[in-house]
Amino acid sequence: MSEKTFHKAQTIRAKASGVPSIVEAVQFHGVRITKNDALVKEVSELYRSKNLDELVHNSHLAARHLQEVGLMDNAVALIDTSPSSNEGYVVNFLVREPKSFTAGVKAGVSTNGDADVSLNAGKQSVGGRGEAINTQYTYTVKGDHCFNISAIKPFLGWQKYSNVSATLYRSLAHMPWNQSDVDENAAVLAYNGQLWNQKLLHQVKLNAIWRTLRATRDAAFSVREQAGHTLKFSLENAVAVDTRDRPILASRGILARFAQEYAGVFGDASFVKNTLDLQAAAPLPLGFILAASFQAKHLKGLGDREVHILDRCYLGGQQDVRGFGLNTIGVKADNSCLGGGASLAGVVHLYRPLIPPNMLFAHAFLASGSVASVHSKNLVQQLQDTQRVSAGFGLAFVFKSIFRLELNYTYPLKYVLGDSLLGGFHIGAGVNFL
Protein backbone atom coordinates (compact mmCIF):
# COMPACT_ATOMS: atom_id res chain seq x y z
CA MET A 1 0.00 0.00 0.00
CA SER A 2 1.52 3.31 -1.06
CA GLU A 3 2.24 5.89 1.61
CA LYS A 4 -0.16 8.81 1.69
CA THR A 5 1.42 12.13 0.77
CA PHE A 6 0.30 15.46 2.19
CA HIS A 7 0.77 18.78 0.42
CA LYS A 8 0.82 22.21 1.97
CA ALA A 9 -2.28 24.14 1.03
CA GLN A 10 -0.45 27.09 -0.51
CA THR A 11 1.27 24.87 -3.10
CA ILE A 12 -2.00 24.00 -4.79
CA ARG A 13 -3.89 27.24 -4.29
CA ALA A 14 -2.86 28.68 -7.66
CA LYS A 15 -4.52 25.73 -9.41
CA ALA A 16 -7.62 25.63 -7.23
CA SER A 17 -9.83 28.27 -8.83
CA GLY A 18 -13.06 26.79 -10.14
CA VAL A 19 -12.41 23.26 -8.82
CA PRO A 20 -15.48 22.09 -6.84
CA SER A 21 -14.85 20.63 -3.40
CA ILE A 22 -16.68 18.64 -0.77
CA VAL A 23 -15.12 18.44 2.69
CA GLU A 24 -15.63 14.89 3.91
CA ALA A 25 -13.64 15.16 7.14
CA VAL A 26 -11.59 17.52 9.30
CA GLN A 27 -8.97 15.81 11.43
CA PHE A 28 -6.63 17.10 14.14
CA HIS A 29 -3.25 15.57 14.90
CA GLY A 30 -1.57 16.43 18.20
CA VAL A 31 -4.62 17.19 20.34
CA ARG A 32 -4.45 16.17 24.00
CA ILE A 33 -6.44 18.58 26.18
CA THR A 34 -8.40 20.77 23.76
CA LYS A 35 -12.13 20.08 23.95
CA ASN A 36 -13.91 18.69 20.90
CA ASP A 37 -16.67 21.31 21.01
CA ALA A 38 -14.04 24.08 20.82
CA LEU A 39 -12.50 22.54 17.70
CA VAL A 40 -15.90 22.11 16.06
CA LYS A 41 -16.70 25.81 16.57
CA GLU A 42 -13.39 26.81 15.02
CA VAL A 43 -13.60 24.74 11.81
CA SER A 44 -17.31 24.28 11.07
CA GLU A 45 -17.16 26.87 8.28
CA LEU A 46 -14.82 24.63 6.29
CA TYR A 47 -17.75 22.37 5.41
CA ARG A 48 -19.39 25.30 3.60
CA SER A 49 -16.46 25.77 1.20
CA LYS A 50 -17.78 25.57 -2.38
CA ASN A 51 -14.53 25.16 -4.28
CA LEU A 52 -10.93 24.23 -3.64
CA ASP A 53 -9.69 27.81 -3.69
CA GLU A 54 -12.17 28.75 -0.96
CA LEU A 55 -11.26 25.64 1.03
CA VAL A 56 -7.55 26.48 0.93
CA HIS A 57 -8.24 30.06 2.00
CA ASN A 58 -10.56 29.04 4.84
CA SER A 59 -8.17 26.34 6.06
CA HIS A 60 -5.41 28.89 6.52
CA LEU A 61 -7.78 31.29 8.26
CA ALA A 62 -8.79 28.51 10.65
CA ALA A 63 -5.17 27.54 11.37
CA ARG A 64 -4.23 31.14 12.14
CA HIS A 65 -7.29 31.69 14.30
CA LEU A 66 -6.56 28.58 16.38
CA GLN A 67 -3.28 30.23 17.37
CA GLU A 68 -4.61 33.74 17.87
CA VAL A 69 -7.34 32.71 20.33
CA GLY A 70 -4.88 30.65 22.40
CA LEU A 71 -6.10 27.15 21.57
CA MET A 72 -2.82 26.20 19.87
CA ASP A 73 0.78 27.34 19.88
CA ASN A 74 1.16 26.23 16.29
CA ALA A 75 -1.24 24.95 13.63
CA VAL A 76 -0.69 23.98 9.99
CA ALA A 77 -3.48 23.04 7.59
CA LEU A 78 -2.78 20.18 5.17
CA ILE A 79 -5.32 19.18 2.53
CA ASP A 80 -5.58 15.68 1.08
CA THR A 81 -7.88 14.19 -1.54
CA SER A 82 -10.49 11.69 -0.42
CA PRO A 83 -10.05 8.12 -1.73
CA SER A 84 -13.83 7.72 -2.04
CA SER A 85 -14.70 10.77 -4.14
CA ASN A 86 -13.12 12.82 -6.94
CA GLU A 87 -14.40 16.06 -5.43
CA GLY A 88 -13.92 15.05 -1.80
CA TYR A 89 -11.18 16.40 0.46
CA VAL A 90 -9.91 15.76 3.95
CA VAL A 91 -8.44 18.69 5.92
CA ASN A 92 -5.74 17.72 8.42
CA PHE A 93 -4.54 20.14 11.08
CA LEU A 94 -1.11 19.40 12.53
CA VAL A 95 -1.17 21.24 15.85
CA ARG A 96 0.95 21.84 18.92
CA GLU A 97 -0.98 22.70 22.05
CA PRO A 98 0.25 25.29 24.57
CA LYS A 99 2.49 24.15 27.38
CA SER A 100 0.57 23.30 30.52
CA PHE A 101 2.60 25.82 32.56
CA THR A 102 5.03 28.57 31.62
CA ALA A 103 7.35 30.67 33.77
CA GLY A 104 10.11 33.09 33.00
CA VAL A 105 12.27 36.03 33.99
CA LYS A 106 13.03 38.98 31.77
CA ALA A 107 14.88 42.26 32.08
CA GLY A 108 13.86 45.34 30.17
CA VAL A 109 13.07 49.03 30.28
CA SER A 110 9.87 50.41 31.79
CA THR A 111 7.61 53.05 30.29
CA ASN A 112 9.44 55.71 32.29
CA GLY A 113 12.82 54.59 30.94
CA ASP A 114 13.86 52.75 34.11
CA ALA A 115 15.44 49.31 34.00
CA ASP A 116 13.13 46.63 35.35
CA VAL A 117 12.95 42.91 36.02
CA SER A 118 9.77 40.88 35.57
CA LEU A 119 8.84 37.46 36.90
CA ASN A 120 5.92 35.87 35.10
CA ALA A 121 4.05 32.60 35.16
CA GLY A 122 0.93 31.37 33.44
CA LYS A 123 -1.23 28.49 32.38
CA GLN A 124 -2.72 28.49 28.89
CA SER A 125 -5.91 26.80 27.68
CA VAL A 126 -6.78 25.96 31.27
CA GLY A 127 -10.10 24.29 30.47
CA GLY A 128 -9.24 23.22 26.94
CA ARG A 129 -11.12 26.13 25.35
CA GLY A 130 -8.45 28.83 25.14
CA GLU A 131 -8.76 30.16 28.68
CA ALA A 132 -5.58 31.57 30.20
CA ILE A 133 -4.39 32.63 33.64
CA ASN A 134 -1.27 34.79 33.95
CA THR A 135 0.60 36.41 36.82
CA GLN A 136 3.42 38.93 36.74
CA TYR A 137 5.59 40.75 39.25
CA THR A 138 7.70 43.70 38.11
CA TYR A 139 10.36 45.61 40.01
CA THR A 140 12.25 48.66 38.74
CA VAL A 141 15.65 49.91 39.82
CA LYS A 142 13.99 53.01 41.32
CA GLY A 143 11.85 50.91 43.63
CA ASP A 144 8.49 50.70 41.83
CA HIS A 145 6.58 47.43 42.30
CA CYS A 146 3.64 45.93 40.45
CA PHE A 147 1.90 42.59 40.85
CA ASN A 148 -1.05 41.45 38.76
CA ILE A 149 -3.02 38.34 38.05
CA SER A 150 -5.37 38.09 35.09
CA ALA A 151 -7.74 35.57 33.55
CA ILE A 152 -9.05 35.67 29.99
CA LYS A 153 -11.80 33.72 28.25
CA PRO A 154 -12.13 33.92 24.44
CA PHE A 155 -15.45 33.49 22.65
CA LEU A 156 -14.83 30.74 20.12
CA GLY A 157 -16.36 30.54 16.66
CA TRP A 158 -15.48 31.06 13.02
CA GLN A 159 -13.18 34.10 12.85
CA LYS A 160 -14.61 35.46 16.09
CA TYR A 161 -12.26 37.87 17.86
CA SER A 162 -13.81 38.68 21.20
CA ASN A 163 -13.06 37.86 24.82
CA VAL A 164 -13.74 38.78 28.41
CA SER A 165 -11.04 39.23 31.03
CA ALA A 166 -10.63 39.97 34.72
CA THR A 167 -7.54 41.49 36.29
CA LEU A 168 -6.45 42.15 39.86
CA TYR A 169 -3.36 44.25 40.45
CA ARG A 170 -1.44 46.13 43.10
CA SER A 171 1.16 48.72 42.23
CA LEU A 172 3.44 51.03 44.20
CA ALA A 173 5.01 53.78 42.12
CA HIS A 174 6.90 57.03 42.54
CA MET A 175 5.67 60.02 40.53
CA PRO A 176 8.62 62.43 40.27
CA TRP A 177 6.62 65.01 38.29
CA ASN A 178 4.59 65.92 41.39
CA GLN A 179 6.90 64.65 44.13
CA SER A 180 4.62 61.93 45.44
CA ASP A 181 4.06 58.18 45.63
CA VAL A 182 0.89 56.29 44.81
CA ASP A 183 -0.38 52.87 45.85
CA GLU A 184 -3.13 51.30 43.75
CA ASN A 185 -5.25 48.23 44.37
CA ALA A 186 -7.57 47.52 41.48
CA ALA A 187 -10.03 45.11 39.94
CA VAL A 188 -10.74 45.46 36.22
CA LEU A 189 -13.35 43.65 34.12
CA ALA A 190 -13.05 44.02 30.35
CA TYR A 191 -14.75 42.98 27.15
CA ASN A 192 -12.99 43.13 23.78
CA GLY A 193 -14.90 42.55 20.58
CA GLN A 194 -15.59 43.67 17.04
CA LEU A 195 -18.53 45.32 15.32
CA TRP A 196 -19.67 45.94 11.74
CA ASN A 197 -18.26 42.78 10.21
CA GLN A 198 -15.03 43.02 12.24
CA LYS A 199 -14.22 46.50 10.90
CA LEU A 200 -14.77 48.32 14.20
CA LEU A 201 -12.89 47.32 17.37
CA HIS A 202 -14.84 47.71 20.60
CA GLN A 203 -13.71 47.62 24.22
CA VAL A 204 -15.62 48.09 27.48
CA LYS A 205 -13.89 48.21 30.87
CA LEU A 206 -15.23 48.45 34.40
CA ASN A 207 -12.63 49.71 36.88
CA ALA A 208 -12.66 49.67 40.67
CA ILE A 209 -9.50 51.28 42.04
CA TRP A 210 -8.53 52.08 45.62
CA ARG A 211 -5.72 54.62 45.51
CA THR A 212 -3.48 56.11 48.17
CA LEU A 213 -1.53 59.27 47.32
CA ARG A 214 1.48 59.87 49.56
CA ALA A 215 3.03 63.30 49.10
CA THR A 216 6.70 63.73 49.98
CA ARG A 217 7.99 66.66 52.01
CA ASP A 218 9.13 68.31 48.76
CA ALA A 219 5.66 68.26 47.19
CA ALA A 220 3.73 71.48 46.69
CA PHE A 221 0.76 72.22 48.94
CA SER A 222 -1.58 71.68 45.95
CA VAL A 223 -0.40 68.06 45.90
CA ARG A 224 -0.31 67.51 49.65
CA GLU A 225 -3.89 68.69 50.10
CA GLN A 226 -5.04 65.81 47.86
CA ALA A 227 -2.98 63.18 49.68
CA GLY A 228 -4.76 60.24 51.23
CA HIS A 229 -7.18 57.55 50.13
CA THR A 230 -9.53 57.82 47.15
CA LEU A 231 -11.85 55.30 45.56
CA LYS A 232 -12.62 55.39 41.84
CA PHE A 233 -15.30 53.41 40.04
CA SER A 234 -15.32 54.12 36.33
CA LEU A 235 -16.72 52.76 33.08
CA GLU A 236 -14.64 53.04 29.90
CA ASN A 237 -15.93 52.58 26.39
CA ALA A 238 -13.69 52.71 23.31
CA VAL A 239 -14.19 52.16 19.60
CA ALA A 240 -11.45 52.07 16.99
CA VAL A 241 -10.70 51.49 13.33
CA ASP A 242 -7.25 50.02 12.71
CA THR A 243 -5.86 49.28 9.24
CA ARG A 244 -2.16 49.43 10.17
CA ASP A 245 0.10 46.61 9.02
CA ARG A 246 1.42 46.29 12.58
CA PRO A 247 0.57 48.02 15.87
CA ILE A 248 4.08 49.27 16.68
CA LEU A 249 5.79 51.47 14.08
CA ALA A 250 3.50 50.77 11.17
CA SER A 251 4.67 51.32 7.60
CA ARG A 252 1.16 51.90 6.22
CA GLY A 253 -2.43 52.25 7.40
CA ILE A 254 -4.39 54.34 9.88
CA LEU A 255 -5.66 54.13 13.45
CA ALA A 256 -8.63 56.15 14.68
CA ARG A 257 -9.68 55.54 18.29
CA PHE A 258 -12.17 57.34 20.51
CA ALA A 259 -12.46 56.50 24.20
CA GLN A 260 -14.67 57.84 26.95
CA GLU A 261 -14.35 57.25 30.68
CA TYR A 262 -17.15 58.06 33.10
CA ALA A 263 -16.60 58.06 36.87
CA GLY A 264 -19.05 59.20 39.51
CA VAL A 265 -21.62 56.54 40.40
CA PHE A 266 -19.59 55.36 43.39
CA GLY A 267 -16.42 56.52 45.06
CA ASP A 268 -14.69 59.89 45.28
CA ALA A 269 -13.81 60.43 41.61
CA SER A 270 -16.43 62.18 39.48
CA PHE A 271 -15.58 63.17 35.91
CA VAL A 272 -15.97 62.48 32.21
CA LYS A 273 -12.80 62.08 30.13
CA ASN A 274 -12.74 61.94 26.33
CA THR A 275 -9.66 60.81 24.38
CA LEU A 276 -9.12 60.88 20.62
CA ASP A 277 -6.12 59.12 19.06
CA LEU A 278 -5.23 59.35 15.37
CA GLN A 279 -2.26 57.71 13.63
CA ALA A 280 -1.34 57.37 9.97
CA ALA A 281 1.65 55.96 8.10
CA ALA A 282 2.58 55.73 4.42
CA PRO A 283 5.63 54.49 2.48
CA LEU A 284 7.77 56.99 0.55
CA PRO A 285 10.32 56.52 -2.24
CA LEU A 286 13.78 55.13 -1.35
CA GLY A 287 12.30 53.06 1.47
CA PHE A 288 11.38 55.98 3.74
CA ILE A 289 8.24 55.89 5.90
CA LEU A 290 6.27 59.01 6.82
CA ALA A 291 4.12 58.74 9.94
CA ALA A 292 2.08 61.12 12.06
CA SER A 293 0.29 60.83 15.41
CA PHE A 294 -2.23 63.09 17.11
CA GLN A 295 -3.87 62.88 20.53
CA ALA A 296 -6.49 65.09 22.16
CA LYS A 297 -7.87 64.74 25.69
CA HIS A 298 -10.60 66.61 27.50
CA LEU A 299 -11.53 66.17 31.15
CA LYS A 300 -14.59 67.64 32.84
CA GLY A 301 -15.42 67.31 36.51
CA LEU A 302 -18.97 66.51 37.56
CA GLY A 303 -20.77 68.30 40.35
CA ASP A 304 -18.77 70.30 42.88
CA ARG A 305 -15.88 67.86 43.13
CA GLU A 306 -12.51 68.97 41.84
CA VAL A 307 -10.86 66.47 39.51
CA HIS A 308 -8.23 64.57 41.47
CA ILE A 309 -4.60 65.05 40.51
CA LEU A 310 -4.33 61.34 39.65
CA ASP A 311 -7.05 61.61 36.99
CA ARG A 312 -5.82 64.70 35.13
CA CYS A 313 -4.21 65.02 31.69
CA TYR A 314 -0.42 64.91 31.49
CA LEU A 315 2.14 65.32 28.72
CA GLY A 316 5.89 65.12 28.42
CA GLY A 317 8.39 62.31 28.09
CA GLN A 318 9.96 60.02 25.55
CA GLN A 319 6.63 58.57 24.41
CA ASP A 320 4.89 61.79 23.36
CA VAL A 321 6.49 65.26 23.50
CA ARG A 322 10.13 64.24 23.61
CA GLY A 323 12.66 66.65 25.09
CA PHE A 324 10.58 67.44 28.18
CA GLY A 325 10.47 65.70 31.54
CA LEU A 326 7.98 62.90 32.04
CA ASN A 327 4.49 64.37 32.64
CA THR A 328 5.91 67.84 33.38
CA ILE A 329 4.17 69.93 30.71
CA GLY A 330 1.41 72.11 32.11
CA VAL A 331 0.50 74.01 35.25
CA LYS A 332 3.03 73.85 38.09
CA ALA A 333 3.11 74.74 41.75
CA ASP A 334 6.63 75.09 43.09
CA ASN A 335 8.40 71.98 41.72
CA SER A 336 5.26 69.87 41.24
CA CYS A 337 3.29 69.42 38.03
CA LEU A 338 -0.47 69.49 38.61
CA GLY A 339 -1.71 68.14 35.28
CA GLY A 340 -4.58 69.71 33.39
CA GLY A 341 -8.11 69.49 32.11
CA ALA A 342 -7.23 69.21 28.43
CA SER A 343 -4.20 68.35 26.32
CA LEU A 344 -3.16 68.28 22.67
CA ALA A 345 -0.12 66.53 21.21
CA GLY A 346 1.10 65.77 17.72
CA VAL A 347 4.25 64.16 16.31
CA VAL A 348 5.49 63.78 12.73
CA HIS A 349 8.05 61.02 12.08
CA LEU A 350 10.35 60.08 9.22
CA TYR A 351 11.76 56.54 9.32
CA ARG A 352 14.31 54.71 7.20
CA PRO A 353 14.70 50.94 7.69
CA LEU A 354 18.24 49.77 8.48
CA ILE A 355 19.49 46.22 9.07
CA PRO A 356 17.56 44.14 10.03
CA PRO A 357 14.93 46.09 8.06
CA ASN A 358 11.87 45.15 10.12
CA MET A 359 13.50 45.84 13.47
CA LEU A 360 15.92 48.78 13.27
CA PHE A 361 15.05 52.20 11.86
CA ALA A 362 16.72 55.58 11.52
CA HIS A 363 14.32 58.09 13.01
CA ALA A 364 13.71 61.85 12.84
CA PHE A 365 10.76 63.65 14.42
CA LEU A 366 9.06 66.96 15.16
CA ALA A 367 6.79 67.00 18.23
CA SER A 368 4.42 69.55 19.71
CA GLY A 369 2.03 69.58 22.66
CA SER A 370 0.31 71.66 25.33
CA VAL A 371 -1.79 71.23 28.47
CA ALA A 372 -4.56 73.53 29.74
CA SER A 373 -5.42 73.97 33.41
CA VAL A 374 -8.44 72.25 34.95
CA HIS A 375 -9.61 75.75 35.96
CA SER A 376 -9.11 77.32 32.53
CA LYS A 377 -11.94 79.55 31.27
CA ASN A 378 -10.73 79.33 27.66
CA LEU A 379 -9.20 75.93 26.93
CA VAL A 380 -8.55 76.55 23.24
CA GLN A 381 -6.73 79.83 23.84
CA GLN A 382 -4.56 78.38 26.59
CA LEU A 383 -3.67 75.35 24.47
CA GLN A 384 -2.60 77.69 21.66
CA ASP A 385 -0.59 80.01 23.92
CA THR A 386 1.38 77.28 25.74
CA GLN A 387 2.61 75.15 22.86
CA ARG A 388 5.86 73.25 23.36
CA VAL A 389 7.86 72.09 20.35
CA SER A 390 10.84 69.74 20.08
CA ALA A 391 12.77 68.01 17.31
CA GLY A 392 15.34 65.27 17.15
CA PHE A 393 16.80 62.24 15.46
CA GLY A 394 18.04 58.82 16.46
CA LEU A 395 17.27 55.11 16.23
CA ALA A 396 14.08 53.15 16.79
CA PHE A 397 14.19 49.42 17.54
CA VAL A 398 11.04 47.29 17.31
CA PHE A 399 10.89 43.75 18.69
CA LYS A 400 8.00 42.03 16.88
CA SER A 401 4.80 43.57 18.27
CA ILE A 402 5.96 43.44 21.87
CA PHE A 403 7.80 46.69 22.55
CA ARG A 404 9.58 49.64 20.98
CA LEU A 405 12.89 51.16 22.06
CA GLU A 406 14.09 54.61 20.99
CA LEU A 407 17.49 56.27 21.37
CA ASN A 408 17.11 59.90 20.34
CA TYR A 409 19.04 63.13 20.43
CA THR A 410 16.37 65.69 21.29
CA TYR A 411 16.38 69.49 21.22
CA PRO A 412 13.49 71.58 22.67
CA LEU A 413 12.64 74.36 20.20
CA LYS A 414 9.80 76.12 22.01
CA TYR A 415 9.08 76.01 25.72
CA VAL A 416 7.65 77.94 28.63
CA LEU A 417 9.67 79.39 31.49
CA GLY A 418 9.93 76.79 34.24
CA ASP A 419 9.66 73.75 31.96
CA SER A 420 11.72 70.67 32.73
CA LEU A 421 13.88 70.49 29.60
CA LEU A 422 15.68 67.27 28.69
CA GLY A 423 17.82 67.95 25.66
CA GLY A 424 20.51 65.56 24.47
CA PHE A 425 20.43 61.76 24.23
CA HIS A 426 17.59 59.87 25.90
CA ILE A 427 16.07 56.38 25.83
CA GLY A 428 12.36 55.69 25.57
CA ALA A 429 10.74 52.27 25.81
CA GLY A 430 7.20 50.97 25.74
CA VAL A 431 4.29 50.12 23.48
CA ASN A 432 2.17 53.25 23.08
CA PHE A 433 4.13 55.99 21.34
CA LEU A 434 2.93 59.15 19.65
From Swiss-Prot:
The record's keywords, sorted A to Z, are: Membrane, Mitochondrion, Mitochondrion outer membrane, Transmembrane, Transmembrane beta strand
| Membrane topology of the entry | Multi-pass membrane protein
A Gene Ontology cellular-component term: mitochondrial outer membrane
Q: Which InterPro entries match?
A: Bac_surfAg_D15, D15-like
Cellular location of this protein?
A: Mitochondrion outer membrane
What's the main place this protein lives?
mitochondrion
**One Gene Ontology biological process:** protein insertion into mitochondrial outer membrane
Q: What is the purpose of this protein?
A: May play a role in the maintenance of the structure of mitochondrial cristae.
Q: What is known of its domains?
A: Its C-terminal part seems to contain many membrane-spanning sided beta-sheets, that have the potential to adopt a transmembrane beta-barrel type structure.
Assembly: Associates with the mitochondrial contact site and cristae organizing system (MICOS) complex (also known as MINOS or MitOS complex).
What family is this?
Belongs to the SAM50/omp85 family.
Q: Which PANTHER family match?
A: SORTING AND ASSEMBLY MACHINERY COMPONENT 50 HOMOLOG (PTHR12815:SF18), SORTING AND ASSEMBLY MACHINERY SAMM50 PROTEIN FAMILY MEMBER (PTHR12815)
Q: What is this protein called?
A: SAM50-like protein gop-3
